[in-house]
């Protein structure tokens, strides 16, 4: 085992604080409407330019092992805030730096670190309660657009496109962000249920120009097995032919004789039909087939529940107003299922989301809810260069997370004002002893750090602005973009409550751990030449003989 280097007490804390400050100083220049950019060198390709706090934090690795430990702990704050709310990473970093700096000064002055931490925790719990009271519901398109705009560094086009996407697919709809091909941002909305399975044969195509299959008012046959024998499908085909309506077959697979016969029937115009594979695999496929059944008002023909394909009647089939099938996707528009059944299914999947432990499962379940409840919107980010595209895509994703958080827990006045108001409401909070009171005051002072940093980045005098805002009430604050004071909610400067709350909680949690650190242990650096011993030359290789 390699030898270790150990530092204790003040020596350890000073080194750790240096690391915290290096990382936080690099991240905090991005805060606010006039925050600066940070350029990140990449081992290949063009450098990345970003104003995203967590992207900057992830790039930083310090040479000094003790300093690096401090930096990595603050990096954890940014990552946790990003995971919880998708935004607020820079605010969390600024808060953590402020708490650590103030807290370590108190420790150096002889305060008990454990009581300091308890005081900080008390202040944060009380401040979070105040934030919840200050929170205002965010349920109109204008407020959603404002939240998106603020999170995307005052880019109103991003805020507006996210608000439009949410309006079209609903709060539960899936909104994804992709790199577009044009210079402008584009919004592509898929209404109805779409899944990534295309037609099984190009001979089903009936719209030659678009290269797609389009079925008006089709019946939908859902089968939980492979079909290769056409005899199994005959009853359904005959019933649909009599009704003079098209048929969509969604099965695990349709192959061989069954597929060939369907193609021939379709080409001769005997019955308009198309077949696609069911989405997903294994248990997820069964669940998604059931989703489609509920959406279209049909039932899944499965031998597991004693239903046979040969005995299918028209009432077992689902129905929709329209189905569009391309090479890659199938979209079912306006399924004829009962609204109460669909809502029941959505509630059931939501419960599964709450119980799910893995992020992957949650994401897949969320997609299923969206497909049943709303639809899917794709925001295609447009830019002139690849560097700009990456930077903008990061901002759009941040803004999307922020708007989701705003819809979930509401909004508070932005620009660091909410933290100032929360702090002013708990200024009389008392701890169990004087050292806890110092911890409370450390947290209250730290809650001023975001507004000070926003003001500093805008080139204004931070103390003057902080005092003016503290003297005001409610959502009165400072708009760093224009240099004006006023009502932040009316000016459209909003932060999601969840983002502000998460930033404060994670910053205090990690900062508390750092304040109570008494020893640090790291590997001693390897001395050069400590690897393989010198081989002392290879000696002569001798003659190579008669090798050709």
Swiss-Prot record:
Ordered alphabetically, the record's keywords are: ATP-binding, Chaperone, Cytoplasm, Isomerase, Nucleotide-binding
> Where, per UniProt, does this protein localize?
Cytoplasm
Q: EC number(s) for this protein?
A: 5.6.1.7
The protein's GO terms of the molecular function aspect are: ATP binding; ATP-dependent protein folding chaperone; isomerase activity; unfolded protein binding
Catalyzes what?
ATP + H2O + a folded polypeptide = ADP + phosphate + an unfolded polypeptide
Q: Which top-level group of life is the source organism from? A: Bacteria
Residue positions binding ATP = 30-33, 51, 87-91, 415, 479-481, 495
Role description: Together with its co-chaperonin GroES, plays an essential role in assisting protein folding. The GroEL-GroES system forms a nano-cage that allows encapsulation of the non-native substrate proteins and provides a physical environment optimized to promote and accelerate protein folding.
- What HAMAP family does its record include? CH60 (MF_00600)
Share what the entry says about its subunit structure, partners included. Forms a cylinder of 14 subunits composed of two heptameric rings stacked back-to-back. Interacts with the co-chaperonin GroES.
Entry protein name: Chaperonin GroEL
Q: What is the lineage of its organism?
A: Bacteria, Pseudomonadati, Pseudomonadota, Gammaproteobacteria, Vibrionales
């Amino acid at each position: 085992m390699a030898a270790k280097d150990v530092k204790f007490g003040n020596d350890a804390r000073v080194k750790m604080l240096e690391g915290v400050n290096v990382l936080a100083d690099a991240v905090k220049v991005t805060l606010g409407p006039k925050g600066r950019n940070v350029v990140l060198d990449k081992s290949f390709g063009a450098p990345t330019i970003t104003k995203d706090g967590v992207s900057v934090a992830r790039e930083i690795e310090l040479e000094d092992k003790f300093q690096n430990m401090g930096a990595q702990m603050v990096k954890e704050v940014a990552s946790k805030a990003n995971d919880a709310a998708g935004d607020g990473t820079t605010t969390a970093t600024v808060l953590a730096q402020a708490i650590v700096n103030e807290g370590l000064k108190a420790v150096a002055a002889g305060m008990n670190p454990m009581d300091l931490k308890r005081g900080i925790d008390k202040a944060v719990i009380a401040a979070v309660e105040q934030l919840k009271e200050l929170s205002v519901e965010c349920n109109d398109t204008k407020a959603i657009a404002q939240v998106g705009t603020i999170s995307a560094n005052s880019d109103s086009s991003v805020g507006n496109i996210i608000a439009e996407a949410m309006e079209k697919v609903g709060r539960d709809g899936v909104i994804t962000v992709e790199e577009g091909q044009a210079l402008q941002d584009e919004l592509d909305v898929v209404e109805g249920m779409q899944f990534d399975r295309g037609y099984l044969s190009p001979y089903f195509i009936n719209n030659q120009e678009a290269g797609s299959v389009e079925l008006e008012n089709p019946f939908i046959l859902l089968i939980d097995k492979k079909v290769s024998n056409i005899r199994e499908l005959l009853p359904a085909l005959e019933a649909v032919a009599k009704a003079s309506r098209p048929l969509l077959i969604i099965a695990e697979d349709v192959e061989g004789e069954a597929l060939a016969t369907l193609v021939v029937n379709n080409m001769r115009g005997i019955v308009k039909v198309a077949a696609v594979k069911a989405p997903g695999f294994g248990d997820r496929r069964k669940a998604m087939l059931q989703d489609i059944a509920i959406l279209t008002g049909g039932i899944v023909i499965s031998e597991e529940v004693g239903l046979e394909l040969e005995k299918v009647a028209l009432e077992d089939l689902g129905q929709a107003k329209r189905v569009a099938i391309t090479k890659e996707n199938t979209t079912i528009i306006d399924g004829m299922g009962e609204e109460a059944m669909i809502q029941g299914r959505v509630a059931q999947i939501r419960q599964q989301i709450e119980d799910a432990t893995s992020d992957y499962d949650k994401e897949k379940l969320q997609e299923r809810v969206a497909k049943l409840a709303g639809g899917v919107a794709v925001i295609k980010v447009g830019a002139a260069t690849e560097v700009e595209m990456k930077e903008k895509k990061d901002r759009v994703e941040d803004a999307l997370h922020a708007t989701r958080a705003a819809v979930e827990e509401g909004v508070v006045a932005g620009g660091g004002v909410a933290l100032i108001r929360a702090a002013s409401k708990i200024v009389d909070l008392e701890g169990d002893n004087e050292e806890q009171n110092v911890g409370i005051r450390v947290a209250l002072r730290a809650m001023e750090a975001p507004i000070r940093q926003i003001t500093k980045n805008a080139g204004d005098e931070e103390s003057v602005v902080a005092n003016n805002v503290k003297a005001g009430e409610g959502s009165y604050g400072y708009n760093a973009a224009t240099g004006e004071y006023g009502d932040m909610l009316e000016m459209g400067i909003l932060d999601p409550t969840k983002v502000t709350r998460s930033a404060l909680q994670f910053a205090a949690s990690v900062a508390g751990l750092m304040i109570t650190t008494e020893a640090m242990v790291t590997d001693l650096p390897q001395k050069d030449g400590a690897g393989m011993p010198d081989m002392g030359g290879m000696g002569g290789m001798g003659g190579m003989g008669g090798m050709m």
